[in-house]
Amino acid sequence: MKNFLLPLLTVVAGRAKANFLRKTRHTDAVQAQYLRNLLQAYQDTELGRQYRLSEIKTIEQFRDRIPVLPYSSYEPLTERIFQGEPNILTPDPVVYLNLTSGSTGSKKLIPITKRFQNSLKQANLISMGFLADALRARNLKFGKLLLTNSAQMFGRSPGGINYGPASVGVLRMGKFLYEQLFAHPFETLLPVDSLARHYVCLLFALRQPSMRGIIANFPMLLLRTCDYLERYAEQLIQDIEKGTISPIVELESEVRSQLEYQWSADPDRARELQQILQSEGQLTPKSAWPSLSFVATARGGTSDFYFERFPKFFGETPVFGAVYSSAEATFSIYPDVDTDGSILAIETGFFEFVPQDQWEAEHPKTLQATDVKVGEYYRLLTTNYSGFYRYDIGDVVEVVGFYNTAPLIVFRYRRGGMLSATTEKTTEYHVTQVMQALQQEFGLPLEDFCITLSESLVSPHYLVNIELLPGQSLDNPQSFLDSFDQKLRQANTSYAVRRPKNFIPPPRLRILASGSFATLRQRQLERGIPDSQLKFPHISEDRQFLAGLAVEREIKLSQDTADAE
């Protein structure tokens, strides 16, 4: 049955994509119709009555009537939904509550209804249609894929509503669909232990040499999967040969029973993998699955920094962005592989763009999708079936073009994530550009990095904290640091203006001990952040963010005469 369902799914995805493309010729009309439908459906909710949605007839009235509010204004309402009260934000029953990771701020609850979920599912289907066509154009095939996200919910609210990460809700509510796509049983996503879950997902996927894709939320998580594949290659091969699941893998007894029932030995495949391991010295995705056609993960933001390490593991395998989304919304859909620009998802929400000169305004003037300009940066407001109106999650996007009349956008950074020794406002996008260029210039891929400020409250130094990959060394650290300084001046004009006059003192390089960023990630897990949502800021004004990590060396520039802090 599954053999013909996957091609059928691809056909359906292709039709959804074609329909979406037709609508991108009429972006304003599609957006206006979405808003009208939502206002009519939501006018009798508690918030709908408060805002008198039934009286709103135009987009201008909507902007005038509805304020731009942070999550804190919705929190009392989502707490009542958590307790089970109906018709607060949505007229439809809430079937799930997305709990945001809290990796870039406090945690939030986002109500999910079937209507909302269906709109997001449609965006995913459209992205699948784009991917299938992009692969076909490159003589590659779409097919089964590996995903290691947890499918474990966090719990059930007093009102009887399941809650957890957004990805868990997507997987649970779309279980039948995803079972057609996975190269491993759905039950492999159930182990609580992160390593155990990755192990069994890899184990079952390795049985399928013709697997076509690998998916993870962020590039860093794909690299972690590659690390597990390399580290546990011998044990995985042994389990494939013998038809066992190693007792050292920490599985709940019920999950182990379910997986062992579906597992059997494959000595031929084990022999093939052993030969690859012996000839190449390691297992990588590209060697284990020679038919690999794509990897799908987040693009934009800090992704380019991690992409520098992809060729070692994936060769020239195309990288697909799928959809640009958060727990609150799906913002855009990627039309092709190896591209950062994604098409505004005009059927999943009503979107407004806040120009830079309005970012500090209490009631910002906004633009519609067709009014934005290429090369400009905007904050993105969304109104959708979650019951949030003109909601600003803080993402800053750049418009890089248009697809018919719909803008192509790229996520650049989250507003508020800025670094300032004075008033220069260095963003995560600035430093990611710089660190990516440094990796290329010095031929030195890094484990990770984070730019912080020194302890001084007056004229603090930029601290360039890096961790080298095992076996790597930085032979000319002062040149590396000087190049960082020069490249950051090029990336951020405000930094460039303040550096020569020493308003911003010279940066300093700190080489952290091996395993430092693994320690940071473990700290996040201990804070309750799901392992599939792991990400951390690459800039931080929190002087304690890297507290407790060992610094192997600190390097200063020659003009830096101040004592090290």
How would you describe each model-predicted region?
Residues Q117, K121-M128, E428, T432, ...:
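Amphipathic alpha-helical segments in well-structured domains
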Residues M1-S54, F62, I66, L77-R80, ...:
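Active-site glycine/GP-rich loop and adjacent strand/helix microenvironment
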Residues G48, K108-P111, A132-K144, Q235-D239, ...:
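Short secondary-structure capping/junction motifs at helix and strand boundaries
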Residues G105-P111, L146, S157-P158, R212-G213:
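Conserved small-residue
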